[in-house]
């Protein structure tokens, strides 16, 4: 059963079309990736799903009871500790959000190593954290909020290779516990390796793929990066 469906979605900035007849389905417990170059419209697509922007035409069917959205722009107050920013996020939905203790127990169950890194970052002030630390902390905090629809806009951007591994571990753990996840990335290999299916957003269209092998075959490419480049520049 689909948790989220987009049907023939179109969007334009004034008279400039950005998306044409976009269709996407996300089932419960499914992990779907969105690939696309800068400016292709990945963030706009997520904004449409979250009702931040309105489509020019088409339909969005969203049956999620609780959804969260990690945006690209994160500006936590620099004098707060990261744990305090986590409390602010959690308290935005205080009636149903898990307690901090419950979140930490869940994270330790996912990965003791990830729990340790998260705990270390939580004690630092925002001003002393790198961009990657801030982004990874926000991503993990949102994943721990027990939402049924999780939308992550480039969660691994600016994050080191080790923490990228742990973020994907957490994403997969949340999915295995019932969450449906939409995630965008510039890293073609990590999308192909971790997602059940993925889409390529290019030239105003959303193209579906079941595997990395399929996109390579369709674009006669010898690598995922080559396939990404060819798909980005391909025109109907």
Question: Where in this protein do the model-derived segments appear?
Answer:
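The feature captures the beta-strand-to-loop junction immediately N-terminal to the Walker
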Residues: 35-37
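H-loop/switch region of ABC-family ATPase nucleotide-binding domains
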Residues: 184-186
């Amino acid at each position: 059963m689909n948790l989220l469906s987009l049907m023939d979605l179109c969007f334009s900035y004034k008279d400039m079309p950005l998306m044409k007849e976009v269709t996407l389905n996300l089932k419960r417990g499914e992990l779907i990736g969105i690939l696309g170059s800068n400016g292709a419209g990945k963030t706009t697509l997520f904004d449409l799903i979250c009702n931040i922007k309105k489509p020019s035409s088409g339909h969005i069917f969203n049956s999620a009871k609780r959804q969260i959205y990690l945006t690209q722009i994160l500006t936590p107050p620099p004098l707060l500790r990261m744990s305090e920013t986590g409390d602010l996020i959690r308290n935005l939905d205080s009636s149903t959000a898990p307690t901090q203790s419950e979140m930490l127990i869940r994270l330790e169950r996912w990965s003791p190593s990830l729990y340790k890194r998260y705990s270390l970052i939580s004690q630092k002030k925002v001003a002393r954290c790198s961009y990657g630390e801030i982004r990874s902390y926000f991503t993990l905090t949102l994943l721990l909020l027990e939402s049924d629809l999780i939308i992550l806009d480039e969660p691994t951007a600016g994050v080191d290779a080790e923490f990228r591994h742990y973020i994907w571990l957490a994403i997969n753990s949340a999915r295995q516990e019932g969450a449906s996840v939409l995630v965008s990335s510039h890293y073609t290999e990590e999308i192909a390796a971790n997602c059940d299916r993925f889409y390529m957003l290019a030239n105003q269209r959303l193209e579906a793929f079941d595997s990395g092998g399929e996109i390579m075959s369709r674009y006669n490419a010898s690598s995922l990066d080559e396939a990404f480049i060819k798909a980005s520049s391909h025109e109907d």
